Swiss-Prot record:
Chain positions covered by the region annotation Domain III: 153-205
Name this polypeptide is given: Holliday junction branch migration complex subunit RuvA
Organism: Bacillus cereus (strain ATCC 14579 / DSM 31 / CCUG 7414 / JCM 2152 / NBRC 15305 / NCIMB 9373 / NCTC 2599 / NRRL B-3711)
Sequence segments annotated as region (Domain I): 1-62
Listed HAMAP family: DNA_HJ_migration_RuvA
Predominant subcellular localization, coarse grouping: cytoplasm
Subunit structure: Homotetramer. Forms an RuvA(8)-RuvB(12)-Holliday junction (HJ) complex. HJ DNA is sandwiched between 2 RuvA tetramers; dsDNA enters through RuvA and exits via RuvB. An RuvB hexamer assembles on each DNA strand where it exits the tetramer. Each RuvB hexamer is contacted by two RuvA subunits (via domain III) on 2 adjacent RuvB subunits; this complex drives branch migration. In the full resolvosome a probable DNA-RuvA(4)-RuvB(12)-RuvC(2) complex forms which resolves the HJ.
Function: The RuvA-RuvB-RuvC complex processes Holliday junction (HJ) DNA during genetic recombination and DNA repair, while the RuvA-RuvB complex plays an important role in the rescue of blocked DNA replication forks via replication fork reversal (RFR). RuvA specifically binds to HJ cruciform DNA, conferring on it an open structure. The RuvB hexamer acts as an ATP-dependent pump, pulling dsDNA into and through the RuvAB complex. HJ branch migration allows RuvC to scan DNA until it finds its consensus sequence, where it cleaves and resolves the cruciform DNA.
Entry similarity comment: Belongs to the RuvA family.
GO function terms (MF aspect): ATP binding; four-way junction DNA binding; four-way junction helicase activity
Location(s), subcellular: Cytoplasm
Length: 205
């Protein structure tokens, strides 16, 4: 129904943002609302209008590719909007695609609500069908196994750090806030934890 919404970020919450467009506030659920910052500059959010008997909601994404992966995930049995958002909340779109293409169940089951059965279903339903989702930086992932193994290693260290944060009592929304910053660097598990704690304690988003 809506391709995108352009406007000003009026509110940022744990689950959604409100975009003000011509005096109308659009409540848009996003994978990580904290990647959007309140400002006087207009932004564009690519949207997906989800309608079912018991729910009608707008879901928003920073790129068309992210939205496309969301819609493909919705087509997998056992994954609903909340589950799809949780998968995308890490900001690791390319690595999710890599995991599916290389049948890496261990990576996929680390997402909230994804068990072994759902991970296998994701691979069965989506493997070989995600080339149009992959950003330019990952155009050769389907043939470059060595690069995948290297990225999977650093991803494992980040995953361990995120699990440690959860074990320390940080809520999922707090963990999601710092993921974009952590993804900018390649660190050891301990270094990821120290940096994440610094970001959380300083309130940086």
């Amino acid at each position: 129904m809506f391709e995108y919404v352009t406007g000003y970020v009026e509110y940022v919450g744990p689950e959604y943002v409100v975009i003000d467009h011509n005096g109308i506030g659009y409540q848009i659920f996003t994978p990580n609302p904290y990647v959007f910052q309140r400002s006087k500059q207009e932004i564009r959010v690519y949207t997906y209008h989800y309608v079912r008997e018991d729910i009608m909601a707008l879901y928003g994404f920073k790129t068309r590719e992210e939205r496309l992966l969301f819609t493909k995930l919705l087509g997998v049995s056992g994954i609903g909007p909340k589950g799809a958002l949780a998968i995308l909340a890490s900001g690791q779109t390319g690595q999710v695609v890599q995991a599916i293409e290389h049948e890496d169940e261990k990576f996929l089951v680390k997402f909230p609500g994804v068990g072994k059965k759902t991970a296998r279903q994701m691979i069965l339903d989506l493997k070989g069908k995600l080339a149009d989702v992959v950003p330019d930086a990952f155009v050769d992932l389907f043939s470059d196994t060595e690069r995948f193994d290297e990225k999977k290693g650093s991803s494992a260290e980040l995953d361990e750090a995120l699990e440690a944060l959860r074990a320390l009592g940080y809520a999922e929304r707090e963990v999601s806030r710092v993921v974009p910053e952590l993804l900018k660097e390649s660190l050891t598990t301990d270094q990821y934890i120290k940096k994440a704690l610094s970001l959380l304690l300083n309130g940086k988003r």
